[in-house]
Amino acid sequence: MFGSSPTEQGRFARAWTAWENALANLESPGFGSSPSTDYARAFARIENHYFKNLGFLSKSQQIKDNMHKILDIPSIIVQGRYDMICPPGTAELIHRLWPNSNLVMVSKAGHAMSESGITTALVRATEQFKN
């Protein structure tokens, strides 16, 4: 995805993006759609840039170690029960550490924001903070 050959970049980026898309949706047929090369290259490069830089966290426990900074901020955590990209256990852990949080576990959803249960929960969460 970062090599000098545009053909190779496109091939690997499309494979990465198709794999991610196959995992993201609970109703996935098990193979990802075939995104455009430009979209796939941008998506895969951004995502892998974060992975390569460990999410720009200086240490693995940084989020947990800094929870005290946001404890008073109300939040709604929306999580798909069958999310294979960001496992539900991580949302449950953050929820336990964050007293001002509300965890909405969407029972029939994976990772994709486009899944109807996730979309509905995100809109509801946004509406709660509107005022």
What are the roles of these predicted feature ranges?
Residues 82-83, 110:
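Short, glycine-/Ser/Thr-/acidic-enriched flexible segments
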Residues 70-71, 77-79:
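Short beta-strand/loop motif that positions the catalytic acidic residue
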Residues 68-72, 97-98:
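Short, conserved loop/helix-junction motifs that constitute active-site signature segments
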Residues 1-66, 73:
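Alpha/beta-hydrolase
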Residues 101-131:
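Catalytic active-site module of serine/aspartate enzymes centered on a nucleophile-bearing elbow/loop
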Residues 84-90:
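Conserved alpha/beta-hydrolase "acid-adjacent" motif
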